[in-house]
Amino acid sequence: MIEADRLIAADAQSEEEFLDRAIRPKTLADYVGQPQVRGQMEIFIKAAKLRGDALDHLLIFGPPGLGKTTLANIVANEMGVNLRTTSGPVLEKAGDLAAMLTNLEPHDVLFIDEIHRLSPVVEEVLYPAMEDYQLDIMIGEGPAARSIKIDLPPFTLVGATTRAGSLTSPLRDRFGIVQRLEFYQVADLQHIVGRSAHCLGLALTDEGALEVARRSRGTPRIANRLLRRVRDFAEVCADGRIDGEVAAQALNMLDVDAAGFDYMDRKLLLAVIDKFMGGPVGLDNLAAAIGEERETIEDVLEPYLIQQGFIQRTPRGRIATVHAYQHFGIDRAE
């Protein structure tokens, strides 16, 4: 099993980019949640515009699905400049990056998603571009090779990553602004679901929005995906109107429970509780018990369960916490 196969996967699915673009907020005024990030960016953007400068280079990091691309779009819109978008794996050669940099207009925003996946060769080209707005390019080969410098217009690099720790220190140190996105509160997700429903022309009550928000694992991308699936259910089974009861019925049918867990989450938790008496259990034994690869457990299933306090990793193995027992209504044997 891979993460993209799950309805509650935080990573973007191929068909979602166009749909998400239609409901994506365009300004900081429409940006819900992340109050500290929003407040800081409002000040930084206003200050840059007052000075007539490009915004300082911005690094955005955090779990997938929290709105890093959305924030990059908002920065460009608020600055009134163009947004050029690419990703680390796409920039294979130094020339790929040079082509993008030389086509920028003054103060434009260059957005590099998955910036931690830049190759060392491309990263070396980026250093003088970020620091001095200059591009160092080698022309020719062998003894005839020579370096030329090309002046670039002032621009803003916005880098996004889910793995800030994988960035090299020289690259990380060149970002003047660093923002971490946190998982969203249910109230903020309810607001986001309501706004998305309005953009999509859906009849959604506050209770319906709350039900979707509670099961969205703190992630707007998941909330919007669940909303679209609930819409399908409502159009067929409830005359298109989504209240709390309809949303709950739809999400139960989709096997997403009140905590946002799907079948695989529950299977893992129940294996620890029932088959290994709550743990500790080694990763290989747990993988064999649920019929999954150990990498799937470590990379796909465990992170959210650990973050929510349902599973603990210890030197002796995995342990189910009291929250896991309470979720299933099971008494914990002392």
From Swiss-Prot:
Entry-linked CDD domains: AAA
TM region(s), chain numbering: none
A biological process term (GO) from this entry: DNA recombination
Residues covered by region (Head domain (RuvB-H)): 258-334
Subunit structure: Homohexamer. Forms an RuvA(8)-RuvB(12)-Holliday junction (HJ) complex. HJ DNA is sandwiched between 2 RuvA tetramers; dsDNA enters through RuvA and exits via RuvB. An RuvB hexamer assembles on each DNA strand where it exits the tetramer. Each RuvB hexamer is contacted by two RuvA subunits (via domain III) on 2 adjacent RuvB subunits; this complex drives branch migration. In the full resolvosome a probable DNA-RuvA(4)-RuvB(12)-RuvC(2) complex forms which resolves the HJ.
Function recorded in the entry: The RuvA-RuvB-RuvC complex processes Holliday junction (HJ) DNA during genetic recombination and DNA repair, while the RuvA-RuvB complex plays an important role in the rescue of blocked DNA replication forks via replication fork reversal (RFR). RuvA specifically binds to HJ cruciform DNA, conferring on it an open structure. The RuvB hexamer acts as an ATP-dependent pump, pulling dsDNA into and through the RuvAB complex. RuvB forms 2 homohexamers on either side of HJ DNA bound by 1 or 2 RuvA tetramers; 4 subunits per hexamer contact DNA at a time.
Stated name of the protein: Holliday junction branch migration complex subunit RuvB
